[in-house]
Amino acid sequence: MTYWDSAAILRVYVKEPDSDVFERLLARGDGPIQVSTIAWVEILCALHRKARVGDLRPDQADSALDKYHPDSAAGRILHMGYGDDVVAEAGRIMALNFRQERSIPIRSLDLIHLATAIAGRAEALVTTDARLRRLASLARLRVLP
């Protein structure tokens, strides 16, 4: 199973220049994908931000949500909870990061995504974030695309 961060999954539901890459990746998957329950909040905020600055019309934001909900309800998207296992994994990842000669700067929510992926035993992480990609590689998690 693959874990998708919110920016990656959003590219499936909101057209971006590289959306086709993520659509193909999702289509060739072998089952449901994992996302953090926190990703839902990030998706809502991203859609609101895109609508507010004029990158999306409000009806396009609604359409993205209308597409996401059935995929989630059908079990194609598994929402992984935020619990003690994720917190412990985040601590382990940061301990590994601190031991590096040059640690990788990481935002809190990105660390939660990575820790959730590892705690959920994901085989790979789908993200576009350069720092998250580097930290996932350090934690020995395969990164896509």
Where are these regions (language model features)?
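Hydrophobic/aromatic ligand-binding patch that stacks against planar heteroaromatic rings
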Residues: 25, 116, 135
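Internal alpha/beta domain cores that form substrate/cofactor-binding pockets in large enzymes
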Residues: 82-84, 105, 136-144
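Short glycine-/small-residue-rich flexible loop motifs, especially phosphate/cofactor-binding loops
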Residues: 69, 114, 133
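Active-site-proximal, substrate-binding regions of enzyme catalytic domains
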Residues: 38-97, 138
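A generic local structural motif
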Residues: 19-21, 66, 111-114
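A short, N-terminal amphipathic alpha-helix
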Residues: 25-29, 70-71, 119
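Active-site neighborhoods of divalent-metal-dependent phosphate/nucleic-acid chemistry enzymes
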Residues: 77-128
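Short, well-structured N-terminal submotif of metal-dependent ribonuclease cores
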Residues: 1-63, 130, 139-144
